Amino acid sequence: MEMGLSKKLVLVTGSTKGIGKAIAKEFAREGADVVINGRKAEDVAKVVSALKEEFPQTNPQAAPFDITDETARNQLLEQFPEVDVLVNNMGIFQPMEVEAITDAVWNRFFQTNVLSGNALAKHYLPKMLEKDFGRIIFIASEEAIMPSGEMPQYSMTKTMNLSLAKSLSKLTKATHVTVNTIMPGSTLTEGVEAMLEEMYTQSDLPKEEWEADFMKNHRPLSQIQRLIRPEEVGRFVTFVASPYASSFSGEALRIDGGLVPTIF
């Protein structure tokens, strides 16, 4: 289905790998001009080059800036003062026991997972309202509504994403601008692949059975009993950004394979 995103300028933060990269690719597939963001210029350049080769009708652009740094973030905003779609995907996670989480760790997660995206939203939202079109999408996690206890500092920031997006959506009343949050469940990113490698390399279990074993023993509530693929998240994000999802406003949308057992 044609999503109506051709030639839209889309900024996806943290888009050199994982879910962010998959989101960027799906936007490019829809004909959007995607701004690729990451801290390492060489990683950004590789993704931009790959998108240009696969989708020559589009104009992917590079934004090699660490958006947790105010100076670098301002450079990004100067280079791209307006966008049609902002996907706040960039974030960090790390399993930690609560006793080990220092104030410095709490602050780092807050700065990275909340304040950086908030700063971009504060810049772009007024411009979207002026032209009466725009989409801001925060990528959270099922941890936002069902904390596992494995990484409280991460779960807290993802819950804050939900509240922030809902608050920002209140500013878009009677416009064609929307602000929403998407909560993916466990997804087969490079980071998760590395985690499985670490968990199972020393075991006798064949590699092709790692995923099923992980889901059975570590994500037993999942109804699909497999890891979500990044491109599945990417396709959902492009739909939420499209004109077809214009009635979605202030929503917390789940794509978790049934992992969260509650209705709401």
What are these regions (language model features)?
Residues S141:
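Residue(s) in the substrate-gating loop at a strand-loop-helix junction
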Residues A121, T157, A165:
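Active-site helix of classical SDR
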Residues L9, T16-K17:
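Conserved glycine-rich cofactor-binding loop
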Residues P126, K170-L171, S246:
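Alpha-helical segment proximal to the catalytic Tyr-Lys
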Residues M146, T238, S249-F264:
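Short C-terminal tail/terminal secondary-structure segment
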Residues K173, T178, F248-G250:
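Short, small/polar-rich loop/turn modules that mediate ligand/substrate recognition or access, typified
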Residues R73, E97-V98, V105-F110, H218:
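Substrate-binding pocket helix/loop in short-chain dehydrogenase/reductase
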